[in-house]
Amino acid sequence: MRRTVIRGRESMAKIKINMTFECLTWRQPVISSIIQKCVEATLTAEGVTAPCEINVLVTNDRGIHAINKASRDIDRPTDVLSFPMFQLEAGNLPEDWEDYLDPESGLCPLGDMCISLERAIAQAKEFGHTIRREVGYLTIHSMLHLLGYDHMDEGPQKEQMRSREEAIAAAISGMSRN
């Protein structure tokens, strides 16, 4: 399996995103661009003021299946996985991020996300919207997990997360449901 690593790109908000694409053919500027926009939009919407670092792996169903099995003992592929570095509380993030900063980089390592582009393409077709919107939505979903949101219940937690996902997506050009 060939891997391509795109060196971390820093935005003006001091966000470093380390993207790894497992297939050279998937090194699409549009995918990188929407991931970056959605990471930035989520951090802004959630009021994160710390300089952050996020690792993103874009893989296929086989790759995410292996990660899902190894990390969660779930023997099937999924669309996105999130691995937060810290246990944060959704909607109640720290005002002072000093204790979370890596002393070497000066950045807050929020965690890792894995996206199955193969699954995103299938879901975009299934839901009748663009691949761009699906990858963006999965990125926002994963970022919210890194920031302490969860949807394990069918009640308020899930509703809160869904509401945040839709609000953030609506604020990004090209991310509307249509």
Task: Show which residues each predicted segment covers.
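An acidic/histidine-cluster motif and surrounding catalytic segment
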Residues: 2-136, 144-178
